[in-house]
């Protein structure tokens, strides 16, 4: 994901975009339904379009201008295994939509995760102030059904050592589809917050 992000940023800069990192947007100036600019921790920036692509923070951010972005943060877990014979760095990512699982190579082992049919909601009243990509406590009981599905696809997981089980919040839409485009409530307010693949 970081390589994709850096590539998109490079392309945006080549097209004239300015990217401000570590800069908090504190407000959006709207005059008669037209976006005029944004207030930031670094000062005012004049603009006619706002693109809200801030993941699980998008819902709260959009509310400041009356835009509803239907997102929910849920706990998302994946495990990382010890090296497995036959797994190589050029192994393609494997997704099994029937089992709702995914697999990709990680230092000779596998990252394996899945999308639970009964996810655990997190921060339903808003992301806690000061939360910045921290991890949540692992929940082995909740991960067990995903593991059972994975064993049916990748039997080598039965004997693979597990380095870690990681749990972190991710944002999803109620129907699992993407939200991408202009908000109906405000012209030129675009959103692209939940692009997590579930299918």
PLM regions: where:
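A structural signal for short hydrophobic beta-strand segments in well-ordered beta-sheet cores
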Residues: 25-28, 94, 102-103, 180
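Short Gly/Pro-enriched turn/cap motifs at secondary-structure boundaries
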Residues: 69-73, 91-95, 101, 161, ...
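Short, hydrophobic/aromatic-rich segments at coil-to-beta transitions
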Residues: 34-38, 89-92, 188
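Helical element adjacent to the flavin cofactor pocket in flavoenzyme catalytic cores
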Residues: 1-49, 57
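Conserved FAD-binding catalytic core of PHBH/FMO-like flavoproteins
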Residues: 84-115
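C-terminal catalytic lobe of FAD-dependent flavoproteins
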Residues: 7, 98, 137-199
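Conserved FAD/dinucleotide-binding core of flavoprotein oxidoreductases
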Residues: 105-152
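Central helical "cap/lid" subdomain
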Residues: 44-90
């Amino acid at each position: 994901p970081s390589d994709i992000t850096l590539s998109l940023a490079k392309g945006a800069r080549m097209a004239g975009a300015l990217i401000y990192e570590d800069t908090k947007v504190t407000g959006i100036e709207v005059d008669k339904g037209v976006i005029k600019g944004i207030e930031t921790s670094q000062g005012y920036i004049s603009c006619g379009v706002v693109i809200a692509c801030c993941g699980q923070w998008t819902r709260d951010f959009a509310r400041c201008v009356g835009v509803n972005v239907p997102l929910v943060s849920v706990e998302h877990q994946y495990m990382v295994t010890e090296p497995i014979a036959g797994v190589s760095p050029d192994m393609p990512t494997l997704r099994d939509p029937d089992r709702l699982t995914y697999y990709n190579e990680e230092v000779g082992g596998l990252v394996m995760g899945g999308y639970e049919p009964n996810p655990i909601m997190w921060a339903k009243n808003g992301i806690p102030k000061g939360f910045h990509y921290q991890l949540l406590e692992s929940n082995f009981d909740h991960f067990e059904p995903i593991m059972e599905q994975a064993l049916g696809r990748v039997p080598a997981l039965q004997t693979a050592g597990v380095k870690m089980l990681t749990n972190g919040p991710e944002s999803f839409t109620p129907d699992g589809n993407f939200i991408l485009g202009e908000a109906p409530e405000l012209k030129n307010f675009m959103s692209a917050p939940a692009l997590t693949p579930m299918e």
